[in-house]
Amino acid sequence: MQMASRKVIAGLMVLALCITTLSSAGSDVEAKAKASLKTKKISVKVGKKKSILIKNKTKKHSYSFTSSNKQVAKVTSKGKVTGIKAGKATITVKEVLKKGKKKKGKKKKRTLGKVKVTVTGMKKKNVATPTPETVNKATPTATPSATAPVEPTASATPATTEPAAPTPIVTRSPAPRPTLAPGMPELDKNNLTVADYPGIASDVPDLDIIRVGQNYYMVSTTMNLVPGVPVMKSTDLVHWEIVNYACNRFPDKDLFNLENGQQTYKNGSWAASLKYNEKTKLFYVIYNVNNDGFYCYTTPDIENGTWKAYYIQTSFHDPALIFDGDGMYVIYSGNNIQKISLKESSAEGGIGKVVKEGSSRALFNKTLGGFKWSLWEGAHAYKIGDYYYLMIIGSYGSWFRREVCYRSKKLYDSKASDWEAQLIFEGSTYEYGTGIAQGGIVDTIYGDWYGFLFQDHDGLGRVPSILAVNWDYVDTKNNKYYPDWPMMGYYDDKGNFVNCLGTSQKVKNPLTIQLNKSDKESYIVGDDDFSYPDFKEGDSLKKVWQWNHNPDDANWSVTENPGYYRIKNGKVAGNIWFARNSLTQRTVGPNFTSETCVLTENMKPGDYAGLAAISAHYGMVGVKCDENGNRYVFQGCNSDTNSGAKAKKEDKIKENAVSEEKIEGNAPVYLKIEYAFNTGKTRADKANFFYSLDGENWKSIGETFSLGFDTATTFM
């Protein structure tokens, strides 16, 4: 199967055009000397100026200069560059033939080249900044704004926004700033990474993130997919790759095996929490499976290790794990706490037990802070400095997501009166208009803090974005001070922190992260030629793959026909919902293409095989084998399109179109789906289907398929 982002394809096209241009320029080497740039790189300090010089200027031409980032460097019509703020920009220089001077065969305009500009230093301003003593401390119990949610305009196209200034180092934190450990890299201010929005344009919901050394690890909900709970790794908080899975396989139960009409769509591994315990030297992952129970997994090696499993048949909704002293605690359903311990299984490789220690209780009342939530979940718990922090998502209705923080200097032995509440983020991004919430915070080896929250993006799923965290925020406009609260927001064009506390407020700039940009381009999706020459029983496929529910290992293979993933019908299924051994990957916005080639000679009457787009429902392109054994390309979808749960055993594949060509022998059939995610603009996410019999000439087939997000069916 081949998967490629439209952005990657476009990048290759640009590279080819550059090569062509250089080749044609080479044919003019013997010609008269032309105007050219004297230098391709310049450096200028903030507030200073420097000119771009051109050799061999002529009176017949004028010259234009354009900056790629006017917030970093501006340029005049005479080529004089002014440094605005620290960062990098590119000045494009063009030569224009003056009016009336054009001769036959001569181009009126040509690009001389590009000058890379590095702006260094920050210009200091004599602006009085309020100190904590001159402003009022924020009242933690203030009632939040009840401004009506803002929906994106149907035809709105987000304006292009340049990255903001580098994040200032926070001057105050509830925990001491870390000392850079031996071997840790120094921060390179000229190689910082930039996070745009969304942070990851893919379905990565309910994320939780930790730092161990200079590495960041993140887990996410993958519901019914196996292996479950992907562990993603990054060194710069922007580029992520899947390195492991906590749950290699669900327990052998009907709902996980698609047996007897049971399934675990919209359930499965839900809202995982990830922690590292310095005392035990173990990584811990916990999650809840609705209608089944609570699971905990541990490993000493998060990237390459195997995981021990523990289970209890009880429910801890959206759990957060926190260690305090020698105690292990689960915060769940927003404000409840339960102390637990782990008991090893006596059987080798068996599942251990999660043991409740004492009874559970509520830490505080949900009305603390004057909040009246219709949604209250997604807990994340931390001990930072003198405080225990509990972060949750809250909503008054209309599904606008908000992030709320609760804190106390006591945890398990705390009283309700020990807790305070503060709304720390209420807003969205310039890219999309629904609220951002539910996630965690993480520090860097240099002492900066960032928040990771997610946002509903219709058919694309629930996508994460990164926000700046300020522990010492002074709101000069409203004369408020928020000491030791993790207020979230962004940095404006002047480098000032802006906190969002209203449904109409938006993050307006990408965020420059105080981390060295990774030189490794990592992705959570990828290609596969299904070549596994050393594959043996028990081995895994590439980390980008997940099965839909537990696989039936007796009926799939990558070794029987090397270079192909072989699926056998171990049982009859009337639809994709109950077809075992289906392989899946996430899609990536804004545009995405998935392709595969199938060999279908062994299909039997009534069989279907192919490529599907699954969201709230499914559409597919594939091969059908009719009652006479003839095979044709078809495009279809699920027949039950009601708004309720659609993943039913009784549902049948609805055929929307069938090709005229009959497939003979073992002739390859090439299938393709093109995705266009337009959330935030038209909110119309679409998929179109294509097939080819030679791999080169593609034909469109069937209907355009509308993608959507539905909590009643897949929750993806």
Kindly label every feature range from the protein language model.
Residues 144, 154, 166-170, 174-716:
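Carbohydrate-active catalytic/glycan-binding domains of CAZyme proteins
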Residues 1-12:
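Bacterial N-terminal signal peptides that target proteins for export
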Residues 19-28:
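C-terminal segment of classical bacterial N-terminal signal peptides
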Residues 123-179:
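Ser/Thr/Gly/Pro-rich low-complexity, disordered linker/stalk segments of secreted
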Residues 11, 21, 95-97, 111, ...:
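Feature for long, exposed domains in two main contexts
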Residues 27-132, 136-138:
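Extracytoplasmic soluble-region selector
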Residues 17, 40-44, 50-52, 110, ...:
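Generic detection of short hydrophobic beta-strand segments and adjacent strand-loop junctions
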